[in-house]
From Swiss-Prot:
InterPro entries: Dual-sp_phosphatase_cat-dom (IPR000340), Dual_spec_Phospatases (IPR052103), Prot-tyrosine_phosphatase-like (IPR029021), Tyr_Pase_dom (IPR000387), TYR_PHOSPHATASE_DUAL_dom (IPR020422). This is Dual specificity phosphatase 28. It is an enzyme of class 3 (hydrolase). Monomer. Its EC number is 3.1.3.16, 3.1.3.48. The lineage of its organism: Eukaryota, Metazoa, Chordata, Craniata, Vertebrata. The active site is at 95 (phosphocysteine intermediate). PANTHER family: DUAL SPECIFICITY PHOSPHATASE 28, IP21249P. The gene is Dusp28. The keyword Ubl conjugation does not apply. Belongs to the protein-tyrosine phosphatase family. Non-receptor class dual specificity subfamily.
Length: 163
């Protein structure tokens, strides 16, 4: 007789008040409430929104396509996420599989509002969700976003992240 493994939770904690997951996460009402999620960032055009009372939705309408323009959505999305956190809430960022789009947005947030380099921010996301892998187009946009943040002195030009 084989042992059956429990299904992994639909979302994982990346950092305080920041979670990443797949589309099933939005339907996990009890888990959303328990985690203190107040904002769900739905990085998709088609996936359903959250079903938990008191949980707001911000939709970032992009497909998981390297040609999609995610970059223009990063500043307003990260600002909304930070506002939710400053109000005492937590954010869940999700897309269909919790792999590319949501990973890119979580990485951008960690750069913009936690001061991490692109490499360090993505390492944090990947540690929380091992399947995380932004597509090549999103990765290039994250590199451009990092350069923009460095030019604005939001991020240091030389990484200061501990090894």
């Amino acid at each position: 007789m084989g042992t059956s493994e429990a299904a992994p939770p639909p979302f994982a904690r990346v950092a305080p008040a920041l979670f990443i997951g797949n589309a099933r996460a939005a339907g996990a009402t009890e888990l959303l409430v328990r985690a203190g999620i107040t904002l769900c960032v739905n990085v998709s055009r088609q996936q359903p929104g959250p079903r938990a009372p008191g949980v707001a939705e911000l939709r970032v309408p992009v497909f998981d396509d390297p040609a999609e323009d995610l970059l223009t959505h990063l500043e307003p999305t990260c600002a909304a996420m930070e506002a939710a956190v400053r109000d005492g809430g937590s954010c869940l960022v999700y897309c269909k599989n919790g792999r590319s789009r949501s990973a890119a947005v979580c990485t951008a947030y960690l750069m913009r509002h936690r001061g991490h380099s692109l490499d360090r921010a993505f390492q944090m996301v990947k540690s929380a969700r091992p399947v995380a892998e932004p597509n090549l187009g999103f990765w290039a946009q994250l590199q451009k976003y990092e350069q923009t943040l460095q030019a604005q002195a939001i991020l240091p030009r030389e990484p200061i992240d501990p090894e």
